[in-house]
Structures are given as structure tokens and as C-alpha cells.
């Protein structure tokens, strides 16, 4: 099991890396992935215990990696991930790079919401539509 947090709010990752049983509150929490912007988890000790007992890890991913993962999932798989789901995909990539997960292993990635609840891409980057006379088709 791998716990995933945004680098701008990663109290569980910090506690896991320090070997602590409880996570200290993260001050100045900031991430586009609002669903994982949790400065102080109520069940921190349960999460840390589950990660340790599973032989897992806790990983933090930066905002750039989150957005890259969201874009890649849309472009390559046709999936509209929420930023939280992008964080999970980015962490999976990080886990592969660190050999925490084998490339031949089966992994389950959770996308806990939908990209529709977040603002769409910048309008200036969308396709340009032209008016057309449909009768002439």
C-alpha cells in the first residue's frame, strides 16, 4: 500500500519518513488537489500503521507531476482524472522509478473523484470554432 500526498501538504509522508506514529499538523498546506489537502488527519496513526504493515511507502508528488499525470490520462487513456487521481498516477510513476513497485506487478490506482468538479482548461487553449452554414453541407 502506498499513501499519496501532494508535496504542498504531506504530513503523512513526513511522519512515515521520520518513523513517527502520529503526523504533526502541516502548516501552510497548499495544493490544487483539494481532496488531499488535509493538514492533520484524524486517523493518522491508522494510515501509518496500514502502510507499514503492508510493507508499503508514503510518497509526495509535486503540482507539476500531478498536472502532467492528469493530462497524460486524458490524452492517452481518455480519462478525466481529478487532481487527486493525478497525484495517485504521479506517485505510481514515482514508485516505479524507485523500484517500490515492479513493472510486471499489478497495481490498483484509485481516482477518488472526477475531473468535472474542477475548472476546465484555459479557454485560450481550446479549439477554435468557426461559424458555418449547415445548409451548404
Residue map of PLM features:
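Active-site/ligand-binding loops adjacent to catalytic centers
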Residues: 2-81, 124-137
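Phosphate-binding loop/pocket of nucleotide- and phosphate-handling active sites
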Residues: 24-27, 87-137
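A glycine-rich, Thr/Ser-enriched phosphate-binding loop motif common to dinucleotide/cofactor-binding enzymes
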Residues: 82-86
Amino acid at each position: 500500500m502506498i499513501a499519496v500526498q501532494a508535496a504542498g501538504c504531506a504530513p503523512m509522508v513526513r511522519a512515515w519518513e521520520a518513523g513517527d506514529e502520529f503526523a504533526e499538523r502541516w502548516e501552510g498546506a497548499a495544493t490544487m488537489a483539494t481532496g488531499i489537502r488535509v493538514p492533520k488527519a484524524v486517523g493518522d496513526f491508522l494510515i501509518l500503521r496500514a502502510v507499514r504493515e503492508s510493507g508499503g511507502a508514503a510518497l509526495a508528488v509535486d503540482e507539476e507531476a500531478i498536472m502532467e499525470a492528469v493530462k497524460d490520462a486524458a490524452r492517452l487513456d481518455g480519462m478525466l482524472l481529478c487532481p487527486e487521481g493525478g497525484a495517485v498516477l504521479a506517485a505510481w510513476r514515482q514508485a516505479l522509478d524507485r523500484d517500490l513497485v515492479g513493472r510486471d506487478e499489478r497495481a490498483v490506482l484509485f481516482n477518488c473523484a472526477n475531473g468535472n468538479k474542477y475548472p476546465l482548461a484555459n479557454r485560450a487553449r481550446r479549439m477554435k470554432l468557426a461559424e458555418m452554414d449547415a445548409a451548404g453541407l
